């Protein structure tokens, strides 16, 4: 029996044990979760910086990396709502203990809102400023109400996510 078959049997066992309770698969190979997990992490953990320290990029393909987590979320978007609900990991709005730029935080949170079904932050929202609260409300609304979400890849490797919100076409352009 292959490792993949063993993993699939383990997921079937978990599904049987959980019955109708929802399962969020985190760390499970994405294909073995098809139809068995209700939600599944689609990439690596995000980091408090953009792409981890330089030497980790030399040794570890699968590592903590906000950049790589975003790449996985975008490139595995077709699984969302088909195989399971996608969990792109958390986003950050906070300033303390976070080295992401304001633009990087906006990209991370907006991509998570548009392309995932699990929308979580590791921040403590009670500490948010009024501006951060307003941004959280905007993102929450985006996660719940955005329609016709489409992703395009430009020749230069940049992404453009187009979506409709309140009857208007909006877009987010970014490069990883």
Stretches with model-predicted labels:
Residues 4-5, 9-127:
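Glycan-recognition surfaces
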């Amino acid at each position: 029996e292959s490792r993949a078959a063993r993993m699939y049997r383990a997921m079937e066992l978990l599904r049987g044990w959980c019955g109708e309770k929802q399962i969020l698969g985190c760390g499970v190979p994405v294909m073995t979760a098809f139809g068995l997990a209700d939600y599944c992490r689609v990439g690596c953990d995000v980091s408090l910086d953009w792409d981890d320290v330089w030497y980790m990029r030399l040794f570890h393909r699968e590592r903590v990396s906000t950049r790589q987590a975003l790449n996985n979320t975008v490139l595995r978007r077709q699984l969302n709502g088909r195989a399971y609900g996608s969990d792109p990991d958390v986003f950050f709005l906070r300033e303390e203990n976070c080295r992401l730029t304001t633009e990087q935080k906006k990209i991370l949170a907006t991509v998570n809102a548009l392309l995932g079904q699990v929308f979580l932050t590791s921040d403590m929202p009670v500490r948010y400023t009024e501006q951060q609260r307003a941004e959280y409300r905007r993102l929450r609304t985006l996660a719940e109400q955005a329609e016709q979400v489409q992703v395009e890849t430009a020749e230069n490797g940049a992404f453009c996510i187009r979506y409709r919100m309140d009857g208007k076409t909006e877009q987010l352009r970014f490069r990883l």
